[in-house]
Swiss-Prot record:
It catalyses: 3'-dephospho-CoA + ATP = ADP + CoA + H(+). Keywords: ATP-binding, Coenzyme A biosynthesis, Cytoplasm, Kinase, Nucleotide-binding, Transferase. PANTHER family: BIFUNCTIONAL COENZYME A SYNTHASE-RELATED, DEPHOSPHO-COA KINASE-RELATED. Belongs to the CoaE family. One of its GO terms (biological process) is coenzyme A biosynthetic process. Its EC number is 2.7.1.24. The gene is coaE. Transmembrane segments: none annotated. This is Dephospho-CoA kinase. Residues 4-201 form the DPCK domain. ATP binds at residues 12-17. Pathway: Cofactor biosynthesis; coenzyme A biosynthesis; CoA from (R)-pantothenate: step 5/5. It is found in: Cytoplasm. The keyword Transferase applies.
Length: 201
């Protein structure tokens, strides 16, 4: 059974810098967002569940989901929002569990990048959880720059997620990304070396 490490963060906290680096080092990293994207493609399990529930009107002429329409149907109705959260949560969890079991057979150590790791109770899946952390002010600034948002828009997006301060208390390792990229990746190096040392002990 391989050692499984969960990675999480917040919008614009620098998580992709860490996961890209881990892939360059030869590690397998499961990307929960990419899994969801696949599931929402025509023929995917989420696609089928959504069409069965909402009907053919949510399919565009090219066969893809009409995401703006879907979002308005879900977010304008609390019952639909609850249904969506539950059904999507179940299907995504099942798919991630299958990937986890497959990789555990072949990998000594691997990672799973799950944005809502703590919010959706994935903690007990992992030997360790790594949080890519950044101060709130820096997070707002980076998000404004990355997505060309106003300060209010950036604040509003961040308000929809748990604050990183809260996640900091739950993570087993905190990667501080308030400095530059080299400082961040140096912390990853140290954790990887520590993990290899633990495996040898």
């Amino acid at each position: 059974m391989g050692k499984i490490i969960g990675i999480t963060g917040g919008i614009a906290s620098g998580k992709s810098t860490v996961t890209n680096f881990l892939r360059q080092q030869g590690f397998q990293v499961v990307d929960a967002d990419a899994v969801v994207h696949q599931l929402q493609k025509p023929g995917g399990r989420l696609f089928e569940a959504l069409v069965q529930h909402f009907g053919q009107e949510i399919i565009l002429e090219n066969g893809e989901l009409n995401r703006p329409l879907l979002a308005s149907l879900i977010f304008s109705n609390p019952d639909e929002r609850e249904w969506s959260k539950q059904i999507q949560g179940e299907i995504i969890r099942e798919e991630l569990a299958t990937l986890r079991e497959q990789l555990a057979q072949t990998e000594e150590i691997f990672f799973m990048d799950i944005p809502l790791l703590f919010e959706q109770d994935y903690s007990d899946w992992f030997a360790e959880t790594w949080l890519v952390y950044v101060d709130r002010d820096a997070q707002v600034e980076r998000l404004m720059k990355r997505d060309q948002l106003s300060k209010d828009e950036a604040e509003s997006r961040l308000a929809a997620q748990w604050p990183l301060e809260k996640k900091k208390d739950l993570a087993s390792q905190v990667l501080d990304n308030n400095g530059n990229q080299n400082q961040l990746l140096n912390q990853v190096h140290i954790l990887l070396e520590g993990g290899r040392q633990d495996d040898r002990d």
